[in-house]
């Protein structure tokens, strides 16, 4: 039969399992475009995830800000969550930049493999000759894997403004996504 697997864990295509909606044990996933007022206000949800918010149009049709429109759908959930992710666009006009500036502003500090100095790895620490990163304290060069081998063991998220209620995290492209999930236990 088309759209069906037989046996244990069978998945069936129906109104609960479409391209934009996936139902699974314990919940569901519903996808909507930022330009779709109907999709953004479709049903109450406890968790919202927005990807590339700096590329959102200022208005979802004639309904207004897409994030405000979708966030209104969480009002019935006291433990609601809103997650916004984006590469910043134009300085001073970036939605994610503005959100980060009003958040706790957490950055991940890695310990140097040699001296142990905790630091946020920056592009300026990259040695272009070797492709390695230089420690700001001892000036030793280390390959990326040497910094990241202990990523989740000794590093730490440091919040510049810990008293702010909104948690914001600056993620660099060098941080392995599979290890970011483990960090939630230490935030």
Residue locations for each model-derived region?
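Short, flexible loop motifs at catalytic/binding sites
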Residues: 1-187
């Amino acid at each position: 039969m088309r759209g069906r697997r037989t046996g244990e864990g069978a998945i069936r295509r129906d109104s609960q399992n479409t391209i934009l909606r996936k139902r699974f044990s314990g919940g569901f996933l519903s996808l909507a475009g930022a330009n779709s007022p109907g999709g953004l206000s479709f049903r109450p949800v406890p968790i919202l995830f927005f990807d590339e918010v700096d590329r959102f149009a200022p208005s979802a049709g004639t309904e207004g800000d897409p994030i405000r429109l979708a966030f209104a759908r969480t009002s019935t959930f006291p433990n609601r969550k809103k997650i916004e992710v984006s590469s910043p666009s134009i300085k001073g006009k970036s939605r994610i930049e503005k959100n980060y500036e009003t958040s706790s502003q957490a950055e991940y500090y890695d310990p140097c493999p040699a001296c142990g100095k905790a630091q946020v790895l920056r592009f300026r620490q990259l040695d272009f000759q070797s492709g390695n990163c230089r420690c700001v304290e001892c000036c030793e060069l280390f390959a990326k894997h040497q910094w990241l081998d202990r990523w989740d063991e000794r590093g730490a998220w440091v919040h510049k403004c810990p008293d702010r209620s909104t948690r914001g995290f600056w993620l660099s492209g060098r941080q392995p996504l599979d290890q970011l999930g483990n960090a939630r236990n230490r935030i």
